[in-house]
């Protein structure tokens, strides 16, 4: 159930966050409106799957939940703040006129930062958490490493690719053509990052190799 919840979250909220990451590539306000309208009916429900994964982890493995939360409380807290900030920007952008550009920046920032932090959390988990007798004994910033930053960038690119694919399916004309042009670049970047992470992981974590 935990894995299923996380997987569904990555797929569903991935393209959702990807829309915000792709915003800087689209300058036309009407096209940006179209981008947001494609996810407006579903965006606020996608985070439910992340809650399901967290609740499932707490219910099934409370010790693991406590350890992970102790080790990663800072990036998790910042991620939640970014998601809230993004949600506020999503709602207020539709009602703003003179300040729409500011809410666009907030939407871009919230989406990108939340995605990046999710990747850093993944990277920190892959690298391993220092524990003794089920208690986290590492430092507050052990999660902040070059490897976790690289996985953070990887998740940002992956979500951008998911968002690009979503827009290819849901839009047409000029916006769709722009997404078709952007998709190969995102796929190449994602492949390079995936290859680098795959090569570095066994090197940094012999137990995984």
Language-model segments: what does each one mean?
Residues 1-4, 52-64, 193-203:
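Membrane-embedded alpha-helical segments in integral membrane proteins
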Residues 30-33, 37, 63-70, 100, ...:
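Membrane-helix interfacial "entry" motifs
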Residues 12-21, 78-91, 157-167:
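Membrane-water interface of transmembrane alpha-helices
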Residues 42-111, 132, 207-208:
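Membrane-interface helix-loop-helix modules in multi-pass inner-membrane proteins
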Residues 1-9, 67-81, 108-112, 142-157:
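Alpha-helical transmembrane segments
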Residues 92-209:
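Long, contiguous internal "core" modules enriched in hydrophobic/ aromatic residues
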Residues 1-45, 51-54:
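N-terminal signal-anchor module of multipass membrane proteins
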